[in-house]
Design a protein with these regions (language model features):
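Surface-exposed patches in mature extracellular/periplasmic domains of secreted proteins
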Residues: 136-141
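Active-site nucleophilic cysteine motif
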Residues: 116-132
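Glycine- and charge-enriched low-complexity intrinsically disordered segments
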Residues: 209-247
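...with weaker cross-activation on analogous glycine-rich loops/strands in unrelated enzymes
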Residues: 142-206, 212
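Conserved beta-strand-loop surface patch within small alpha/beta domains used
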Residues: 1-65, 71-104
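Second-shell loop/turn segments in exported
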Residues: 110-115
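Extended, compositionally biased flexible segments
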Residues: 58-74, 205-206, 210-221
Length: 247
């Protein structure tokens, strides 16, 4: 654990049961923690920073992360957190249950423009799992890899922690591998429950849609991560809710 991380945890303990807040600042000497005062009217439920604190942190160096805590709460960013994180364009570090959970500033999961290898179905899959607290590797994937003798999804699911489950046992957060104009599975979607899936297909924005007969026919297999727990879908759901109210 770094000195910065130790300072973050100590500040969160001092502030509890109120939420702590602050910044990680990079200077020529290295990274350090810049604690702020939570001026929220309900500090046990929300945090708010004074503009003066933000300016003071910027004067110290480059702000590289925003930090706050969820005392007694959940280790995922809330709906409000995600909305504000996207606006801030910063990584957010969340203190919860004595640990620091670090979230990259990924775009909202819905409404993304498709670009193969940059913002495609695997990017959506990876970013959704990141928000749920599970890290997935990024890897190069050439155009039309499924037509060039590669089977990237099936070759990598087990090595990245997934195991296959029966389609009849689908739970929110499971990953559907589909054959989209291909004889091998070349498309991933996240099952959201209630007959809905979240995915990103070429020439469309990423979206939630019904798991219709069309997609059921295209489904090759269903996979679940060994570290998955049902509550982890909260991290994904909160982003979907934030995006639906984002203005």
């Amino acid at each position: 654990m770094t000195e910065t991380e130790s300072a973050i945890l100590a500040h969160a303990r001092r502030c509890a049961p109120a939420e702590s807040c602050g910044f990680v600042v990079r200077t020529p000497e290295g990274e350090s923690y810049f604690p702020c005062v939570n001026i929220s009217g309900e500090p046990a439920a929300y945090f708010r920073m004074a503009p003066e604190d933000w300016l003071s942190a910027e004067m110290q160096g480059e702000i590289v992360a925003l930090v706050h805590s969820h005392p007694g709460g959940l280790p995922w960013l809330s709906e409000a957190d995600r909305r504000l994180q996207v606006q801030s364009d910063l990584p957010w570090w969340l203190v919860c249950r004595g640990a620091i959970h670090k979230f990259r500033c990924v775009p909202h999961l819905t409404g993304r423009r498709f670009e193969h290898g940059v913002t495609d179905c695997y990017t959506l899959f990876r970013d959704a799992y990141h928000l749920a607290g599970i890290e997935m590797p990024d890897f190069h994937r050439g155009d039309d890899w499924w037509r060039n003798g590669q089977n990237l999804y099936l070759d990598n699911m087990e090595t990245t922690g997934f195991y296959r489950v029966a389609l009849t046992e689908a739970q929110p957060g499971d990953v559907l591998l589909c054959c989209f104009g291909s004889s091998v599975p070349n498309h991933a979607a996240i099952y959201c429950g209630d007959g809905e899936l979240l995915h990103h297909i070429p020439e469309q924005l990423s979206k939630r849609e019904r798991y219709t007969d069309k997609w059921q026919r295209r489904t090759h297999s269903l996979w679940r991560h060994r570290a998955w727990r049902a509550s982890a879908f909260t991290g994904i759901y909160n982003d979907l809710a934030a995006a639906s109210t984002f203005v």
